[in-house]
């Protein structure tokens, strides 16, 4: 119910790739195809994934590609972990930034890991410097003017704004070229006055790390970098320069103490409109065991192989009574799910993974619905359960005779039905022996149709007819005085 759970609206956002992004994407797509062919050749179709990329290159390219800054810094030369002696899960720890302690251990013990981290920092710092140089030249029209135009003249419709012939800053064009997805997320954030949750499968590079770079250029700042804000004594009445423009993180690459403080500040009732912390960013590790309050927007940066994970992430922002600080009319959550598409309709990694996840999820849902429909308490909780999905509780086709219920279907004991029908299941019931006699007769099925002749038991005192084999009351004989 709305007073307990916020209502949700899911928006599936298809974003066409820019020409440069598609060029880099195709480059990595060809690399993945060659690696996959080599893997199949080496293992002859057997299980083996030692060189499989799991579409990591193209998945990351759907989020962001580095611009062509120099011969050494460009999209095609994006650093990749060529790490020897590490297991797949350890490589993923580095790529996705899952565990701070384990990541630091790998950096200290493996020189390849250290070199990879070093190269990624060079790329990111060079990219930031590249954007700053562009920003310096946007003297008369900046990216802040783009946001004002978007909010004032286009009723916060990004498609209309982007397709318009209005002037746009050079910084906007460059950032959009590298990541239309990041730009769409940030512009959607400006559409809500409440707090926002952003989820990505990646923490480093094309995940949250570069998204933070984008947000910095739009005026956002890390909660822990704001020297004006006193985190131990938050005052709703005090206005600071970065109010409504702070973000925080909650994932395995953040210290536990910092994570705890970030979550507490974000969930404060005084922060329901994002005054102290507007955006919280989480990863797969952060999605487990965290409940967020008063969230108005959820942004799913990319699809995942398993739809259950995405549903769990969305569930972090849609918990029981977690929007009670907001007025009833504001207890609404917009879910944005992004995927990149090509203009030639050739599927991208986002499209492929979403398709696989939906197929698996449809199979799972069909099984879950069957369990719900057959559940003993289906009718009891039907009104609440059907708020999420519609289904029909299992019922026997035949109507119970004399409007009496049927015995427990999960036990194949005829006695259960008989006890319910004859009243023996009652607390103070008694067994009364009656005298019946065997008769032959037919049943009236409708006004003009009768059954074939069968034997029945007949009680002369009550006129009740009983089934010959089951002793089950099936009808009653009435005498017509006419």
Question: Could you describe each region identified by the protein language model?
Answer:
Residues 1-279, 284-482:
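Helicase-associated low-complexity regulatory tails and linkers flanking the ATPase motor
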């Amino acid at each position: 119910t709305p007073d307990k759970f916020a209502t949700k609206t899911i928006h599936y956002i298809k974003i066409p790739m820019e020409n440069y992004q598609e060029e880099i994407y195709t480059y990595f797509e060809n690399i993945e195809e060659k690696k996959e062919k080599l893997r199949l050749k080496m293992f002859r179709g057997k299980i083996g994934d030692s060189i499989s990329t799991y579409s990591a290159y193209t998945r990351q390219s759907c989020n962001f590609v580095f611009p062509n800054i120099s011969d050494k810094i460009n999209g095609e030369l994006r650093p990749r972990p060529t790490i020897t002696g590490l297991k797949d899960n350890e490589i993923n720890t580095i790529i996705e930034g899952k565990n701070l302690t384990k990541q630091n251990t790998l950096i200290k013990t493996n020189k390849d890991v250290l070199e990879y981290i070093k190269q990624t920092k060079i790329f990111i710092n060079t990219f930031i410097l590249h954007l700053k140089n562009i920003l310096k030249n946007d003297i008369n029209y900046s990216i802040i003017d783009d946001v004002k135009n978007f909010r004032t003249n286009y009723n916060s419709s990004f498609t209309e704004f982007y397709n318009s012939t209005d002037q746009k800053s050079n910084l906007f064009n460059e950032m959009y070229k590298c990541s239309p997805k990041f730009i769409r997320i940030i512009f959607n954030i400006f559409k809500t006055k409440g707090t926002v949750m952003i989820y990505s499968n990646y923490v480093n590079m094309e995940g949250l790390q570069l998204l933070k770079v984008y947000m910095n250029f739009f005026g956002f700042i890390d909660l822990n970098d704001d020297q004006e804000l006193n985190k131990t004594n938050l005052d709703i009445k005090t206005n600071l320069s970065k109010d409504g423009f702070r973000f925080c993180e909650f994932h395995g690459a953040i210290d536990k103490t910092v994570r705890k403080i970030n979550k507490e500040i974000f969930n404060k009732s005084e922060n329901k409109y994002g005054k102290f912390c507007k955006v919280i960013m989480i990863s797969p590790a952060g999605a487990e065991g965290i409940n967020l309050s008063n969230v108005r927007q959820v942004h799913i940066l990319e699809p995942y192989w398993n739809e259950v994970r995405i549903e769990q992430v969305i569930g972090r922002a849609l918990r029981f009574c977690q929007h009670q600080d907001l007025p009833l009319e504001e207890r609404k959550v917009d879910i944005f799910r992004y995927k990149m598409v090509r203009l030639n309709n050739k599927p991208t990694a986002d499209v492929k993974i979403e398709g696989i996840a939906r197929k698996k999820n449809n199979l799972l849902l069909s099984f879950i619905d069957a369990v719900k429909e057959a559940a003993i308490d289906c009718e009891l909780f039907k009104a609440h359960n059907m708020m999420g999905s519609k289904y029909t509780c299992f019922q026997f086709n035949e109507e119970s005779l004399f409007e009496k219920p049927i015995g427990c279907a999960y036990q194949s004991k005829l006695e259960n039905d008989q006890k319910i029908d004859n009243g023996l299941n009652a607390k103070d019931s008694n067994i009364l022996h009656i005298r019946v006699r065997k008769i032959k007769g037919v049943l009236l099925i409708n006004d003009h149709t009768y059954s074939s002749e069968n034997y029945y038991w007949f009680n002369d005192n009550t006129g009740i007819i009983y089934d010959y084999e089951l002793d089950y009351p099936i009808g009653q004989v009435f005498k017509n005085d006419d």
